[in-house]
Structure formats: structure tokens, C-alpha cells
Amino acid sequence: MTPPLIELEGIRRSYRSGDVVTHALRGVGLSIHAGEFVAIIGASGSGKSTLMNIIGLMDRPSDGAYRFGGRDVATLNRDELAALRRGCFGFIFQNYHLIPTVSALGNVEMPAIHAGAPRAYRHRRATALLTRLGLANRITNRPSQLSGGQQQRVSIARALMNGGAVILADEPTGALDSKSGTEVLGILKKLAGDGHTVILITHDSKVAAAAERIIRIEDGLIVSDSGPDPEKVSSSIAVVPWQASDSSPPLWTWLEEAARSAFAALAINPVRTALTLSGIVIGVASVVAMMAIGRGAQASYIERASAIGTNWIVVDRAGESTGNSLPLTPADAQAIKDMDNVSGSMPAMWDMATMRRGNIDLNTDVVATTAEFRTVHNWDMAKGTFFTKQDEVSGGPVVLLGATLASKLFPGIADPSGSNILINNLPFLVTGVLESKGLSERGTDRDKRAVMPLRTATMRLFGKDDLSEIVVSIADMSRLHETKEAIKALLIRRHGREDFYIYDSASAFQKAEDERRSSNLLLSAIAAISMLVGGIGIMNIMLITVSERTREIGVRTAIGARTADILGQFLTEAVVLAAIGGVVGLLLGAVIGVGAALLFGMTVIFSVTMALGALMGAVVMGTVFGFMPAYRAARLKPIEALARG
């Protein structure tokens, strides 16, 4: 006689609710051999379902011993029990317990997915099982598109996917019409005939009559047992003791299937998914667009500032000259030029004037200066010639035009040199056009100005010789601070007081950089808060998802999903959700950046590193905030999950 496949000795199961203890099983002893077709019959509350759950390793007894294939299952941990369920048991439930978002083929494949079987094998075997059960033309249908009988056949195919050495059928005909019920019982009889151990749980004596052995249970005790078929017990069916396996699906297969399931689950409620994504999308888009615009602004600032050199100091008057202050004068500029480490000193007077040519009138800046203008600002001519030393001395009526100003006064004329214009109704000769320098660091157009000799402006236009500023070029920028202090001391000696102020290109750059950093910090904080809100949204939606899919968790666990499988499944969904939000955020950020460039003429510079960092931040956010819901799902016991679902 072969040893029993299933041995139960003194099995008890009690449940406590407050101070009330309910005894579902009161010392059940039972042996079932491989290949038997057994029906366990009892009324509602008799303990038959509790007994099935213990036999199927979905629940543990409060007391007693259970051996499967000769091994005490009490020694197995949670994942070892899952492996045993996955490899040896197949479950057929009264309410089918099919996953509604997955096709018939996908439902049948699921046990093999958790076993790590290759996709081609899974597809081939699941198709063969469904075809064998008469569902060849329903493979791609979802459960909602199948009748009750068809859904139960899908459930049977799922139970057989990993072999199904032991088939546990819990009221398999309870939700079916008589014809479908008869068909299901016929399938179970055939499975028993093929060598499967079939355990049928029912309250109906007519259904139980289909089995070869009938066990009756009442009030948690077995009250009758027709006994096993002696021929089956003494048959040559050998029971190979089962060994727990710690093997798991290959990582890539596991990730692929988890991601596939995640996308399917998220597609169920696209509106809710989109709303959950919004926080992550806004956060990532803010980071990408902000950094692109910020980097572009910084590059533009440096480019604009570099157009006229970056090795300068500006000495500016402290306000209008009064009795208590002295104006800046050309003599001050000359004194500065004679100092050590000064390569050029440009006196400058700024004022507005009206330019006229024909019927074209323009109000623009006039810069009155010396030939030092070219040296200090590194500004060459595009057309014509710079004014001469003789022009400076005589104050001749000559003027140079910026590129923008020239194009407005002389539209369609490439070189206006030699032409005459009126400035404040006085005639001036245009001797040349300056090369284009673009916008200043303050955003004003450097090319929309006129330049003339200092003496010319003093004598003919402005009637004053007070300088607006003195621009000083520095030979050695490493001695910038030393030179600034020397200029300051010189002017205090000349003026008798500090009635001026000095700033330099480095300070201007630093100020602009500080402002940019402050702005970026503020926007980064806003983006971080947005992503934090998005992460909390992911956690909330995943908690809701776990609650809504409790039955699915129970089904997956019943068919052999490990704790890591469930944890990974829901954690992957959270990460996929965050990653989708991150990718959409990247695209939106790129659109915002490009839109800013096209609509406002802004320079934008995208950073691959920053974009990847923002995307990784979103993924990390999904991982962190998705862990708690995933962990909660992974800790659900199969029997509890099925009952709550």
C-alpha cells in the first residue's frame, strides 16, 4: 500500500473575535491517497471550507499535524507554502475568481508566470488547455465576456496550468445552471481518471455522488467517511515527497510580467490614473523647463556680457552734480588711464537724441566718447571707418551708427557711410556702422545707439561736459580688487570725497548668478512640493487599488505567488505610474521650453543629466510612496484576501 498523499491528524481551527472563540474544526483526522476523487459534504458552517483552506495551504491549523507527501507543512515558511501551492495544487472556486482585467489566456497563464515559465511555453500550454476544455474561440475574451460555465472552465484550465496534481474544487457548480454544472462534474471525473487527486467541496449530495469517496462533516467533525477505493490505495501511483524550492522566476521575466500587469491595471481607470500623475508631471516639467530656461538665460547673459568684454570696471557718478559733489571729467579718465594694470580708460557721456532721415524719426541713445571705445569694448566696424583723432579734437559733426539703428534709418541700404542725418535737427555725417553686438546683459539692444566724439556732443548737442561714466579695461583680472581700490583712492584724492561708485563685470556676473540661483531654488522648491504631492497621490491611489483588488491578491497568492511577487507587482505599478508621469513631465517640460524659445525668443538649453535626474526623482518618489501599499498587499493572507474580496 502506498503512503497517503495528504495526512491530517487532530486538526483544529479556532477563530477569536473579541472574547468570542469560534471552533471551525474540532480535531479532524483524514488521509487521502494520490489519484482519489473525494467529496467533502456538509452544510453551511460545518467547517468544510475551512478544511479545504487548510488542505490547500491557504490557512494554517490552530493545532494538529498536516503532512503532504510525507512532510510536515508546519515547518514551511510563507514562500515555501506558496511554492507548494504553485507546484502541486490547483484551485477551482465557486465564484471563479478570475482577474477581470486579463483575458482567458492570461488568467490561465498566471500560475506559470509565478513559476517563472517561459512565455512561449505558457502560451502554448494555456492555449492547449483552453482548447481541450472547448474554449478555443474564447482565448482573448475577458471574464465579463464569458458565460458562467465558460468562466468555470477557464478556472479549471488555470488549476491545471502547473500540473494540478491536487485539484481543490470549492462548490464548483454552485453558481452554474444544471447543464453547465453537469459538464464541470464530468471534467472533474475525467481529471480523476487521468490520475489527478480531486477534492470536491459541496453541500449538495447529488453533486457529491459524482465522487468515488464521500466524507461528511458536521460542526467541525467528520461524521462519516465511505473510505478510499482499495484498488486506488494499493495502486502503483507513487507519491514523490515534495521538496520546497526557493527558486524564483528570472529577474527579467519577473519585471516584464509585473510591468505588463501594471499597465493593464492602470488602464482600467484612465481618468484616475491621469489625475494621480498630475503632481509628478507638473514637478518634472517644472524642473526640466526651469533648468532649460535658467541655463539658457545664464548662457545668454554670459554671451551678451562677453560681446563687449568681461575685463572692465565702470566708474559711475553718484547722482547729479551738486555743490557737495564733483562731476566725472575727461581728466579723471586720463588719470585713471595712467594707472598700473589699466589697459584703457574710456570717458562716456550718455543722453537721448532724435535721429531723422527723410520721414524717419527715431529717439535713441547717443554715446559720446573717445577712440578708447574700440579698445575697451573690443568693438570693430562693420562698414566705414571710426571717427578720427582730428574729429575728437575739432568736435566735427560725425557719427557712427549701431547696426539696428542703421537698418531703421537706412532700410535696404547696406552701407550708409557718407550719408547725412539730422540729430536734434543738426546735420551729421555718418562715417560708419558698428558691428552687431546684440543685447546687453540687461536685455537692451546695444546696436540701437549712435556713437560720436565726446567733444562733438559737448559742443553741438548737450552743452555740458559732465561724464556719465568712465569705463576702465583691466590688464590682469587677477588683480581686479587691488585695481578697484587704487582707482577709488585716486578719485577720492581728486574729488575730496567719495561721490562716485564703482562696479565691475565680475560683480555683475555674480549678482546675476545669485539672482538666478535664488530663482532656481524657489522654483525647485515648488517643483519638489509638486512631486511630493504627486508621491502622496500615488500612495493614496495605490492604497485604494490594493483595497479594490484584494480578491485578485487572494487569487494570485492562492495559485502560488510569493510575498515578493505581490510586493513587486504593486511596487512596480507605483513605479510605472511615477515613470509615466516622469516621461510625460519630460515631454511637457520640453514643450514649455521650446514654446518659450519660439514665443518669447528666449534661449533654452536642455540638460540630459538634469532630465534624467528629474525622471529618476519621479521613480524614487514612486518607489518610496508605493512601498507601504505594496507591503500591505504582500502581507495579506490568501484566505483573508479571498474572503474580503
Curated annotation (Swiss-Prot):
Q: Which InterPro entries match?
A: AAA+_ATPase (IPR003593), ABC3_permease_C (IPR003838), ABC_transporter-like_ATP-bd (IPR003439), ABC_transporter-like_CS (IPR017871), MacB-like_ATP-bd (IPR017911), MacB_PCD (IPR025857), Macrolide_Exporter_MacB (IPR050250), P-loop_NTPase (IPR027417)
Q: What is the lineage of its organism?
A: Bacteria, Pseudomonadati, Pseudomonadota, Alphaproteobacteria, Hyphomicrobiales
Kindly provide the name given to this protein in its UniProt entry: Macrolide export ATP-binding/permease protein MacB
Cellular location of this protein? Cell inner membrane
Q: Care to name a GO molecular-function term for this sequence?
A: ATP hydrolysis activity
Keyword field = Antibiotic resistance, ATP-binding, Cell inner membrane, Cell membrane, Membrane, Nucleotide-binding, Translocase, Transmembrane, Transmembrane helix, Transport
- Assembly and binders: Homodimer.
Q: What CDD domains would the database entry show?
A: ABC_MJ0796_LolCDE_FtsE (cd03255)
What is the enzyme's class at the highest EC level? Answer: translocase
Q: Which Pfam families match?
A: ABC_tran (PF00005), FtsX (PF02687), MacB_PCD (PF12704)
The UniProt function text for this chain reads: Non-canonical ABC transporter that contains transmembrane domains (TMD), which form a pore in the inner membrane, and an ATP-binding domain (NBD), which is responsible for energy generation. Confers resistance against macrolides.
What family does this belong to? Belongs to the ABC transporter superfamily. Macrolide exporter (TC 3.A.1.122) family.
